[in-house]
Amino acid sequence: MKINITENIKISMRGYTIINVNAYWEENGRRYAVKACDGLKIDSNDKEVILRGSYDGRNVEWKLCNKGNYITAELTIQSKNEVYIDALCAFRGEIKPEEANQKFLKVPFDNDDWVKFESKEYSKSEMGYGVSAVYNQNGALIIGALEYDIWKTGIIPNECIEVRSGVTDKLTRDTIKHGMVHGEIVKSPVIYIGESRTWQQGMMGFADIYNEYNTRLLWHGPIPFGWNSWYAYMKEIDMDKYMEASKFVSKTNFYDKNVSYINFDAFWNVGLTSEELLKAAEFVKERGQIPGAYIAPFAGWIKEDCIDDYVTYDTGERVRVDGF
């Protein structure tokens, strides 16, 4: 893998060449390209290329590091005063495959709503989330974010492929724009651009590097086995159906270390009274199972006029999230 800075930054990989590589950030609804910064300087060696410049009191640094069979890219905006950044793109470039017929592997943001991985012709593809792949018979290009603690990142397969941090849409389960990230220093996630013989091998390689950047959350309990009401009953769940499921599971080997979960999915708060919920939970416990319900801080179906019945309080004040 080579990074050539004499031709407006070109990256050569297995089966692919990426030309006109650039980066940008968005602020107050406007886009600013790194290469358009004032006083732009380029420092380079065999291992990395660093572009530094400034714009309107902001110091801008864009770093590309050659790691052998993959490259990392990172964009940093720094100012004496806080900056408010809408989005960052630490990698954008025009892909030139040695062979045509390249495809794009779209990776979904999550597994909700029966969403699937999709592989289509590059020109007919849509944004992937977190990590995606461009591939043909000669090789694969894996592009993704190695960090997810601040930004939601999408891989956009346009004429120039770009890795945009600050994406939201219906497939990220958002109905509002990505929030601005602010501070005296605002960084993009570290972006991974790797090559491989196949996209399958490439994804395994990406996972290995991802694990170097992120600590796995270890689970010390038994393997979670259980039953969930949605597939069988959807919104028709009631106490009798739930208890029958508990009986069935108790007669099978669907458990690990004698632990299994019997879970209510959505509509449990409609199909059962409070008394029925308590009775069902006790029924499950008597069989050595653990009862559960589908609810989370960010998955609530609460009517506005009932909000005060559900919110939590801290030191006597109602806890607010994002101003609500």
Task: Give the location of each predicted region.
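A short acidic (Asp/Glu
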Residues: 86, 272-275, 304-305
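The substrate-binding groove and active-site-proximal loops of carbohydrate-active enzymes
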Residues: 223-240, 260-274, 319-324
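Surface-exposed amphipathic alpha-helices with a cationic face
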Residues: 250, 277-292, 296
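Carbohydrate-recognition beta-sandwich/jelly-roll modules
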Residues: 1-256, 287-290
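Generic recognition of stable, solvent-exposed alpha-helical segments in well-folded globular domains
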Residues: 201, 240-244, 272-279, 294
